[in-house]
Amino acid sequence: MEGEGLKLAAKYSYVCEKARLLKFSNDLYDYFRHGKGEAERIEKILKNLLSYDFYRRIAQLNHKEPFDEEVVSFYWKGNPELKGEEWIHNASTLIPIIQIKMHQIVEELVDDCVVHPAKISDKISNREWWVIYQPITKTLKKDKLTLGPKVELIVQNELDLDLKEGDWVTVHFRKVIEKISQKEADKLLQLTKEALRNFNKKNKQKAR
């Protein structure tokens, strides 16, 4: 369903305003949260984001439309299983920094941009929760990006999801986006590890 795919794309994209990449954060939020705004206008906004190019690539490989819900879901969290794992968000978001020398890469910025699977560990308030996740960090030699040991992080539940301890969620820019299954969390973690391995190989070759 393209209508649901458009809402899902808006849901993951609205937080990119924090990275100063997006001027229409409130428009996207109002669309998927409150049904405000025209679908045609939201689609136009989303088509101007870098993620749309990867929706198209995934859609072509799988004979679907770019805003098909399965295409958008696969791009952001690697589920359901489709062709085009090299174009999912956690792989494609690393492309712009492939040629940057490792010591110049700020892993905290990469960590914010990546979509993380995380497990709810404790409640602070309805809008703030502790989660356990594996952050993007550098190896001891500072020559590769990797997933670090599990740590706790405070995240925002701006979407007022019904959360409880033990729930699995996706986190983007320290905001909870969706509740997911443990199977989906495991898959996203696996794909993120693969994306980092591929990035490190290319970065070593190009950033000289």
Stretch-by-stretch model annotation:
Residues 108-126, 132:
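Structural detector for short beta-strands of small beta-barrel domains
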Residues 130-135, 144:
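Short, acidic/hydrophobic/Gly-rich beta-strand patch recurrent on exposed beta strands
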Residues 159, 171-184:
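Short, charged beta-turn/beta-strand-edge "cap" motif at the junction between a beta-strand
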Residues 167-168:
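Structural motif
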